Design a protein with these regions (language model features):
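DNA polymerase sliding clamps and clamp-related checkpoint/processivity subunits
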Residues: 2-32, 38-166, 172-188
Length: 188
């Protein structure tokens, strides 16, 4: 008799808080505008995402702490390559009364479930997303001293960028007594 024990590495993340499910959706809405694909590093402290725009000008990083999720389970650190546009389309199917569950076993496929909150009725939507192999190494993000600190709500910044992107792909931010956002492109 041959006895084989397979170790299935699993990860399950759940968001049930309405505000957090909306924030999670906005994260991928904005990521898809910066990068085509990202690699999620799932570890005991949370999820870490680092990426770069196609022109290799903008390096970004994002960390969602484990305690930010309503449920955070994982067996071992995982690296999940995700296509930003596709995950955004899936999460965008979420209705206001739905929770989000992300789950994978052995990092082969990402299962996204959008299901009604407790006490709510509705349809459960299940999606299976093929993960992609991203051959990248984490870059060291240097500490930088900035001449100006700007605090703005992420939704306000997203709205500004969306509105200015209508006029072109360039965005300049001028800091002085006032902060000025200027969008420009081929037409002006």
């Amino acid at each position: 008799i041959l006895n084989i024990n397979l170790l299935l590495l699993t990860m399950e993340l759940v968001l049930t808080n309405k505000q957090k499910t909306n924030q999670f959706s906005h994260i991928f809405k904005n990521l898809k505008n910066i990068s085509t694909d990202v690699e999620m590093h799932v570890k005991d402290t949370g999820i870490y995402i680092q990426g770069m725009d196609p022109g290799h000008i903008c390096l970004f990083e994002l960390e969602l702490k484990a305690y930010w999720f309503d449920e955070y389970k994982f067996d071992s650190p995982l690296r999940l390559g995700i296509h930003c546009e596709l995950i955004h389309k899936i999460i965008n199917c979420k209705e206001e009364h739905q929770n989000i569950r992300l789950k994978t076993t052995n990092g082969e496929k990402l299962h996204v479930t959008l299901y009604p909150r407790e006490g709510q009725s509705g349809i459960t939507k299940e999606f299976e997303l093929s993960l992609i192999d991203i051959d990248s190494e984490l870059l060291e993000v240097p500490e930088v001293e900035y001449d100006a600190d700007i605090e703005i709500a992420s939704q306000d910044l997203a709205n500004l960028i969306t509105q200015l992107s209508v006029f072109g792909k360039d965005l300049n931010i001028k800091c002085g007594e006032n902060v000025v956002f200027k969008g420009s492109g081929e037409l002006g």
